[in-house]
Regions:
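Active-site histidine-anchored catalytic micro-motif
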Residues: 1-145
Length: 145
């Protein structure tokens, strides 16, 4: 069974933003000969996450507000006591971003059927930047026959 590993690179915007990476995943699958199998999508960062949900602008705004309520940036967090940690000079104050990421997931597995993602009508693969702006990578592993 062939296994193909690829990366998706994303330049994110400040703060929290959500990117629909479904088109890039579809493009990667189309570039292979795999017709039936699965694709693993994995976020390689501790302040990013993935989810499968509807890519609707107002819902995405609701999700951002919901995440900010779960871990407000203005709250006090031990991780943000940079003077008590051995950190690089450019270390951001971002405990809230780590906590938001913990409420989501770092990976999704989606079936491939007849060369296409087996997503539902309103489903998209969403990449969550929780501590932007940054250059991010998403690991994609396509396997099957």
């Amino acid at each position: 069974m062939p296994i193909i590993n690829k990366l998706i690179e994303i330049q994110t915007e400040p703060k929290i933003n959500i990117h629909n990476i479904t088109p890039q995943i579809k493009e990667l699958i189309a570039s292979t000969s795999i017709k039936n199998g699965q694709v693993l999508v994995f976020s390689r960062h501790t302040t990013t996450a993935l989810a499968i949900n509807e890519n609707e602008v107002r819902l995405l705004e609701d999700i951002k507000v919901f995440l900010q309520k779960l871990a407000p940036e203005s709250d006090s967090y031990l991780h943000n006591d940079l003077h008590l940690r051995d950190v690089p000079e450019d270390e951001p104050i971002n405990a809230h971003s780590h906590l938001m990421a913990m409420m989501l997931t770092t990976s999704e597995i989606i079936p491939i059927v007849d060369g296409k993602l087996a997503l539902g009508t309103w489903q998209s693969v969403l990449f969550f930047e929780l501590d932007g702006p940054r250059k991010r990578t998403v690991f994609v592993q396509i396997s099957g026959e």
